[in-house]
Amino acid sequence: MEFSLANLQPKERASFALRALYEAAGCRKYHMGRFEEYSLYQANRSFLSSEQVITFTDLDGRLLALKPDVTLSIAKTAQPAPGETLRYYYHENVYRPSAESHTFKEIAQMGLEMLGAVGEAQVQQAVGLAARSLEQLGAAWVLELSHMGYLFGLLDALAVPETARPALLDLLREKNAHELRAAAKAAGLDDAGADTLCALLTLCGGCEETLARAEAFCKNDRMRAAAAELRALTRSLSAGGGSVRLDLSLAGEMEYYNGLVFQGYLQGLPRPLLKGGRYDLLMQKFTPGADAIGFAVYLDELDRLSAPLPPVQQQKTDRVMLNVALPKGRLGDKVYGLLARIGYGCAEDYNATRKLVVENPEAGIRDFLVKPSDVAIYVEHGAADVGIVGKDILTEASADVYELLDTGLGRCRMCVAAPNDYQDDPSRPVRVATKFVNIAKNYYASIGRDIDIIKLNGSIELAPILGLSDVIVDIVETGTTLRENGLKVVTEFLPISARFIANKASYQFKHREVDR
């Protein structure tokens, strides 16, 4: 029987192509032949994509783990000599929680690491191999670059306290300008400083134009050095072609990443396929004075490329279509009315049809009518490019999306409410009725209060009236329902309004359509 590469799955074909690429670049294959002790992952848990790890007890009583990561093991065992650069690639399965199944999943991963003496040449080689890796995978691609030195330099220039930096970086990653400004003010920045930090979100786009603006924006030598490194790097990449973009709000974990960070996207996939960066701070935990840069490719994502597009999403026009998830109900009606007034309405009145998809090919818009609680899911998983969703739903789902705009629509607040005569008893857990389980847990954890959660799906106000709970956590708009049922607001802790969100991969390929 004749063997043909065409009979292989996409991830199998990719593994052959990437192996040939990495070996031609002088990389040796690294194989993890043993289980690591759980303590390795526990000590470096913020480097991992999830703190949840599968553990087991070995025959000698040691607590071991099924590997959630390969880079940590390579960094621990490599031990490069001074002046030496080690180059490894790997093809391993790692074990991580799946966002889709909410269970642990075996994930096929290939990656490349350069450790030891890592200078400009090694950085350019590593990022060049990342770009060439994307080229091997058979779809349009984007490689997105940023630099932690640029971010740290700006935070230094603005005198941002160390304790405030992780939260600000999280908001930068989300492109969440409205909450970033408030957090900056809370961290002690004045209006000018908050505006300067928010301006970082505008430093994204094509390399030449964005670099010119980034260089003009520099406040100190650290920022200028980072911009110079990015300019040299993009010049080396331009010779190889491809779609390379800068986004200086892209940030890695600040405890480990200190230089270049990057992500790679393939058209048709809802999340980054490739992630990498310079992690000298991690490497120096194991080998003082050594540096490191590397990346991982998530091969399982390629299986999605072989699935045919549903008919409703197949291109019927030369114009790029922006897929919008609209919530059914009053909020969706308001948003649709706004879109229609600026030329993005559809020929069919979506309130007068039972269709769930309506479109306007001339305007390049396609609307999906979705249950409000599902909007974030459709956007996160790439079924829709953008959507309008309440902050309550977005927070409850912890959706991995860009939160681009606070529309100001549907303003209300998340509150703790209780009977008018309620007195907290600190000697026992508070019984909390809510449909926002994660929001309630996180709020009470932030104040150090033990709770028992009672999940309900409606008529939440009834729970304390009948003694089912002590308090409720729910959305309050006017407070009329609470007052008419003998309840009062105890605490307001989360302002709610409708947010404009975007899928992170869609934003790379349709940023012009999203920004318009």
Task: Identify the role of each PLM range.
Residues 1-64, 124, 128:
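TRNA-binding/sensing appendages of the translation machinery
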Residues 7-25, 36-37, 71-82, 89-139, ...:
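Positively charged, Gly/Ser-enriched RNA/tRNA-binding surfaces
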Residues 32-51, 146-156, 250-259, 461-468:
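Beta-rich nucleic-acid/ligand-interaction surfaces
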Residues 51-53, 63, 86-90, 107-111, ...:
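Broad gene-expression machinery/nucleic-acid interaction feature
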Residues 52-58, 160-182, 266:
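Acidic, His- and aromatic-enriched active-site or binding-groove loops in soluble protein domains
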Residues 52-101, 375, 380-389:
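Glycine-rich, N-terminal phosphate-binding loop and its surrounding beta-alpha-beta segment
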Residues 140-152, 168, 245-251, 454-461:
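Short, surface-exposed recognition loops or helix-turn segments adjacent to catalytic cores
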Residues 317-516:
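Domain-level signature for soluble enzymes in the chorismate/prephenate branch of the shikimate pathway
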